[in-house]
Amino acid sequence: MIISAKFITSLVKFDENLSSNFSEVAFLGRSNVGKSSLINSLCKQKNLAKSSATPGKTQLINFFEVTCKRNEEKFNINFIDLPGFGYAKVSKNLKEIWNQNLDEFLKLRTSIKLFIHLIDSRHTHLEIDVNLNDYLKRFLRPDQKILKVFTKCDKLNQSEKAKLKNEFKDSILVSNLNKFGLDSLEDIIIDQTLGLGK
């Protein structure tokens, strides 16, 4: 279980000198899919990760040190809140720099053990999400895993949830509003960062 968390630093671009002694979990997804809200819910802190009121405005790579506990043993991991992608109102030049920085970061950051790909449960087959999944698979190492997490599941009825789970069998459905699915997600995060993931 996650017992505490604190903000460490923000980066505008990849810095190879900022190494990590801990396993890391990267949160990726479209702008406004709920990355910051999910981090806050997992860490049980309302304002740990700041979500921007303007989708696409948050362009920093934010790091959080998270203390976890498993079988009475405490250990630390890092959560990485990545800029939301695919928002049209970001200028083309900024978008290119942004994508280049993220590309370098994701490929070279060997301490990342889990990529959490957040997808809005009401829009599950957007081209941008399909492209992100394919992109991550191209450089995924044996000690890394991609986990699809469908957000805002409180907007779905039981039948829609069952259909979604049946289509994406290894995914997790979550809701920040009613805390649905957060315990299961927490277990996967801890297992994967400890090297116990399936």
From Swiss-Prot:
Q: Specify which residues bind GTP according to the UniProt entry for this protein.
A: 29-36, 56-60, 81-84, 151-154, 174-176
What cellular component terms from Gene Ontology apply here? cytosol
Domain of life here?
A: Bacteria
Q: Where does Mg(2+) bind?
A: S36, T58
The protein's required cofactors: Mg(2+)
Which residue numbers delimit the EngB-type G domain? 21-195
GO terms in the biological process aspect are: division septum assembly
Q: Which InterPro entries match?
A: G_ENGB_dom (IPR030393), GTP-bd (IPR006073), GTP-bd_ribosome_bio_YsxC (IPR019987), P-loop_NTPase (IPR027417), Small_GTP-bd (IPR005225)
Name the Pfam families for this protein. MMR_HSR1 (PF01926)
Gene Ontology molecular functions: GTP binding; metal ion binding
Q: Which CDD domains match?
A: YihA_EngB (cd01876)
Sorted alphabetically, the keyword list is:
Cell cycle, Cell division, GTP-binding, Magnesium, Metal-binding, Nucleotide-binding, Septation
Query: Where are the annotated coiled coils located?
Result: none
| Key word Metal-binding present | yes
Record-stated family? Belongs to the TRAFAC class TrmE-Era-EngA-EngB-Septin-like GTPase superfamily. EngB GTPase family.
**Stored HAMAP family:** GTPase_EngB
* Described function: Necessary for normal cell division and for the maintenance of normal septation.
Protein name per its UniProtKB record: Probable GTP-binding protein EngB
Please report the organism this UniProt entry assigns to the protein.
Campylobacter jejuni subsp. jejuni serotype O:6 (strain 81116 / NCTC 11828)
Taxonomic lineage of the native organism: Bacteria, Pseudomonadati, Campylobacterota, Epsilonproteobacteria, Campylobacterales
